[in-house]
């Protein structure tokens, strides 16, 4: 969501809405919302298949969208697309194959010019480069997770740590949070969540000291102290039930 510039800056706010291609949805909608009276109007629409999760890069003035499908250009799996933000419309730049079905989360590591895509069905974390114009470059790494007992990994979210040293990954299938070295992509830490809790989303606090994890199945918020110089890199300090 971004604020409009000009004389209406205080009144209108721009936002982007991603949708699944069901019940007549066209794709990604650009909306303008009046922050004073709640009025909403559609500014533009770009056709896009199953582009439900979006990420806006303020640095590059680009929007990135996962393509939550099981087929990409005739190949099994989904994709990820890049769009240039131009006033009240989005202009398609390019798209890339996501190496698995149902990619569900995308975020940019702005400092490393990389794009992190979480692929739910196949348990993949795919890292792409970002080109100078904001388009998606070649993949740098494809990381796959699977337990020896046959349980399937379902990566639901990933994000860079505030210090840029690691990538935090939420595995909804195996009930883990992982930390990977952002340069070597080697796993350096793991935290086992309660069985069938379903880690889904991750966010760091503005000061970078805490990580928040939302569990989909147990309806809880887990709070961790992020301490990268300690053996226990993520220390669980609080659990909040959202059912209360």
PLM feature spans:
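Residue-level detector of Asp-centered blade-edge/turn motifs that repeat once per structural unit
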Residues: 9-11, 56-60, 109-112, 162-163, ...
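Short glycine/acidic-enriched loop and turn motifs that connect beta-strands
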Residues: 21-24, 69-73, 121-124, 174-175, ...
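Asp-box/WD-like beta-propeller blade repeats and closely related beta-sheet repeat scaffolds
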Residues: 91-157
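Surface loop/turn motifs at the tips and blade-to-blade linkers of beta-strand repeat domains
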Residues: 44-48, 95-99, 143-150, 191-195, ...
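Beta-rich catalytic cores
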Residues: 24, 50-52, 102-104, 154, ...
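Short loop/turn segments immediately following beta-strands, especially the blade-tip
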Residues: 31-38, 83-89, 128-136, 181-185, ...
């Amino acid at each position: 969501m971004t604020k409009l510039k000009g004389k209406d800056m205080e009144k209108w706010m721009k936002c982007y809405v991603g949708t699944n291609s069901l019940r007549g949805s066209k794709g990604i909608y650009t909306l303008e919302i009046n922050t004073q009276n709640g009025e909403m109007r559609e500014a533009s629409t770009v056709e896009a298949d199953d582009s439900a999760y979006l990420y806006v890069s303020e640095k590059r003035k680009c929007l990135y969208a996962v393509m939550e499908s099981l087929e990409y250009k005739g190949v099994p799996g989904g994709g990820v697309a890049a769009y240039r933000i131009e006033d009240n419309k989005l202009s398609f730049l390019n798209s890339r194959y996501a190496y698995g079905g149902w990619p569900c989360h995308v975020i940019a590591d702005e400092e490393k010019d990389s794009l992190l895509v979480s692929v739910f069905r196949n348990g993949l974390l795919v890292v792409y480069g970002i080109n100078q114009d904001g388009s998606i470059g070649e993949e740098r790494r494809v990381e796959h997770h699977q337990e020896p007992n046959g349980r399937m990994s379902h990566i639901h979210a990933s994000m860079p740590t505030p210090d840029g040293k690691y990538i935090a990954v939420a595995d909804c299938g195996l009930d883990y949070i992982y930390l990977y070295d952002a340069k070597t992509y080697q796993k350096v830490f793991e935290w086992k969540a309660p069985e069938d809790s379903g880690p889904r989303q991750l966010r760091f606090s503005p000061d970078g000291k805490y990580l928040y994890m939302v569990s989909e199945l147990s309806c809880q918020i887990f709070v961790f102290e992020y301490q990268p110089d300690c053996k226990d890199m993520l220390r669980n300090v609080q659990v909040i039930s959202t059912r209360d």
